[in-house]
Amino acid sequence: PHRELQALYTMMRVFMAILCSLLAVCSVSARDSRQKGTDGQAAIYRLPPFERAVRCTKYFEGWHSEKHHPYVGWGHQVQPGERYSARTMTKRQADALLRKDLRKFCAMFQQFGKDSLLLATLAYNVGPYRLLGSGKIPKSTLIRKLEAGDRNIYREYIAFCNYKGKRHAMLLKRRKAEFALLYVP
């Protein structure tokens, strides 16, 4: 019985040594991956602002397939006369289309200077007329504030987070990410 007990203690020591080694390796690995995550987050800020807008839009829009008609690629809304198909669109074509749309919206909001890219990114998601107004839709508080020269627009910007009349958590997260990435103080 004494030898069996000694063997059991030895096995437990070996097991504990292996377990401690495994925990040490896991904690070092987790620390390294967290640091890489931080570097990855910092890396996006090293990109030019337009590239940040493209990456952010792709991340939140996701890929649109045939079931998302009339949206294709990274969220482009097919306009009358356009002949895009979600079935045949490549990632490269969708990327080019996203960039073309963002440039078009930047031009639409160029009078707002350094806020034009932020507004273009918002317009890509909600439509330019939700911001600028037209017919039955009044001009947004965000645009009225910018026209008055007030650039303290965080609250007005993140207010664009409703879907079917209700606040949507993912849209709020998207607005906060866009603002953090694209707002120029």
Q: Which functions belong to the PLM regions below?
A:
Residues 69-72, 76:
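Early exported N-terminus immediately downstream of N-terminal targeting peptides
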Residues 1-11:
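Short, Lys/Arg-enriched N-terminal segments with co-localized hydrophobic residues
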Residues 10, 27-28:
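Intrinsic disorder/low-complexity segments in short proteins, especially the signal peptide
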Residues 19, 29-64, 76-100, 105-108, ...:
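Long, amphipathic alpha-helical surface segments
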Residues 110-115:
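Structural motif
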Residues 17-24:
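Bacterial N-terminal signal peptides
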Residues 116-130:
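Short N-proximal segments of mature Sec-exported proteins
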